[in-house]
Amino acid sequence: MKVLLADDDKVLTHFLSSGLRAKGVETVVVHDAMQAFMSALRSPPDVIVLDVQMPGGTGIEALKKLKQSAKTSLIPVLVLSGSVEPATSEVVKALGAIEFLLKPVGPDSLYAVLCTILKLPTPLIAPV
């Protein structure tokens, strides 16, 4: 599985990408919305994890571009946000996001959601 992880929080992206790589996931990390769109065009991933609030345009703007481009429109997009406003979830799903997760999220739970999205078997995760 190849995942494009787009979030301006470098500590979070390092944490998530390290955890995903430990599970054998190829992870490409970018830190702004425009980089996310350009990276997906250059080398389409299996799934995109996109933060709502980033520099270089919002994650919502990137999601719109991703869904309008013939090259990226069918790639599943999972959106992360620290916002608990129900409107955020409704907006991103209306724009084509397949899933919406509230931060904080860890690599194990993200991996489980990614496997579900891509219909891959998920290993059992031990409770913490």
Enumerate the language-model features and the residues they cover:
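Alpha4 helix (beta4-alpha4-beta5 surface) of REC/receiver domains from two-component response regulators
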Residues: 61, 84-101, 109-112, 116, ...
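Acidic catalytic/metal-coordinating carboxylates
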Residues: 32-35, 58-64
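Short hydrophobic/Thr-rich beta-strand motif most characteristic of the beta2 strand and flanking loop
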Residues: 24-31, 39
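The feature encodes the CheY-like receiver
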Residues: 13, 55-56, 73, 85, ...
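Active-site beta3 strand of CheY-like receiver
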Residues: 43-49
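Charged docking surfaces used in two-component/phosphorelay signaling
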Residues: 14-22
